[in-house]
Amino acid sequence: MPIGVPKVPYRIPGDEEATWVDLYNVMYRERTLFLGQEIRCEITNHITGLMVYLSIEDGNSDIFLFINSLGGWLISGMAIFDTMQTVTPDIYTICLGIAASMASFILLGGEPTKRIAFPHARIMLHQPASAYYRARTPEFLLEVEELHKVREMITRVYALRTGKPFWVVSEDMERDVFMSADEAKAYGLVDIVGDEMIDEHCDTDPVWFPEMFKDW
């Protein structure tokens, strides 16, 4: 029997007593977002809308985006990436599980020095694809040209943010490249592997958010 979205007690600032609210609503109040499904229009609008709202509410506090996704639509993923570069707060990107295809592109889009992968996470990058077989010849040629432009743009972003030469990234994207957290750090996709933070903070305060859950 599915349990649905868990509810947790949360005291809204100004209220005397805690009320039961959806877990995700509590996390949103703590500036913590989740990308845990295929990247399509609905989840893209959801995440980008929250990023804009949180930026308006407080432009100084960081936003945390947890990622566990196999990727999805190219344009939708680029919309999330562009929003991350536009909003005022720094955005932590944290990979747990897997960040594949466009999800790895979003992981890459976090604030430099604030891109994190959990120790057993997997990251995969490859080139964008399109369903050519559905198009007639003129449409096929136009789609190939557009896809080539998008591929070059994505490759340039990977090269710029990882520090790898353009040709290296281009060759790697010819196939599915799976990386461990340590390999992704060496490649430049992330800056920190989670166990490094645990080792550093094991005898001090919580690793992520010292002020988190203060109203629970």
UniProtKB/Swiss-Prot annotation:
Name by which UniProt lists this protein: ATP-dependent Clp protease proteolytic subunit
Cellular location of this protein?
Plastid, Chloroplast stroma
Describe the task this protein carries out.
Cleaves peptides in various proteins in a process that requires ATP hydrolysis. Has a chymotrypsin-like activity. Plays a major role in the degradation of misfolded proteins.
**SS bond list:** none
Question: Which EC number(s) does UniProt give?
Answer: 3.4.21.92
- Active site annotation, chain numbering: 101 (nucleophile), 126
* Swiss-Prot/TrEMBL catalytic activity: Hydrolysis of proteins to small peptides in the presence of ATP and magnesium. alpha-casein is the usual test substrate. In the absence of ATP, only oligopeptides shorter than five residues are hydrolyzed (such as succinyl-Leu-Tyr-|-NHMec, and Leu-Tyr-Leu-|-Tyr-Trp, in which cleavage of the -Tyr-|-Leu- and -Tyr-|-Trp bonds also occurs)
Q: Which protein family is it in?
A: Belongs to the peptidase S14 family.
The protein's matches in CDD domains, at most eight in alphabetical order, are given as: S14_ClpP_2
Q: Which UniProt keywords apply?
A: Chloroplast, Hydrolase, Plastid, Protease, Serine protease
GO molecular function ontology, one term from the record:
ATPase binding
Which GO BP terms sit in this record? Answer: protein quality control for misfolded or incompletely synthesized proteins
Classification from the root reads:
Eukaryota, Viridiplantae, Streptophyta, Embryophyta, Tracheophyta
GO CC terms on record?
A: chloroplast stroma; endopeptidase Clp complex
What interactions and quaternary structure are annotated?
A: Component of the chloroplastic Clp protease core complex.
Superkingdom per UniProt: Eukaryota
